[in-house]
Amino acid sequence: MKALIFAAGLGTRLRPLTDDRPKALVEVAGRPLLQHVVDSLKRQGVDEIVINVHHFADQIIDYVEHKGGFGLKVHISDEREQLLDTGGGILKARRWLEGSEPFIVHNADILTDIDLRAMYSSHIASRADVTLLVASRVTSRYLLFNTDRRLCGWINKSTGQTLPEGVEYAPGVYSELAFGGVHVISPSIFPYLERFSREQKFSITPFYVANCDSLNIVGWLQPVGTGWLDVGKKESLSAAESMFG
């Protein structure tokens, strides 16, 4: 099983911790976030990973080498020249992720004990092109799903912005679910990504919404009783220490 770890971000929400290191190397319970994510993916059967890098890229590359590649097959997707955002990051890593099997995409600042093998199996069983980890959680931005939990749109409750732009979503018609920073993706999306990308840098969310009629993009609900934390912000670090220490 393959996985792409997003480790290229600037980590602005974690400053000043990220003034001298990449977000992926900020420590929780004595181990970098990257190590937590890699260990979790290894336990769940991942044997090949791609790590994208930009901010303090050399530190991540040195860490991977120091760890002997974590005992995995590791590829570095180098974005030092330009940070490509999530959609551009997936497309740049295409050469390592193409094939017949789906792959996992996991943010480096997401810590969870969710059984991603169950999510992966659900993805295959449903014949989805993309499966997104989602939860009923208070946030400002929501993915919108129909009764079959198929993606239909996106809304920012703070600004009123919607995707597709200008669409007015009637209250109560769609399930509003928060995205959890983990995707399972089938390589079937790559031709669609190529056609969508006018520039190298682009976000994956507008792509998903623009293609939700053509691709089977579904939500997979976080199981009750499982742990999940976005450690991309300082206020979550102490909670992460308690949960994963």
Language model segments and positions:
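N-terminal nucleotide-binding beta1-loop-alpha1 segment
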Residues: 1-19, 44
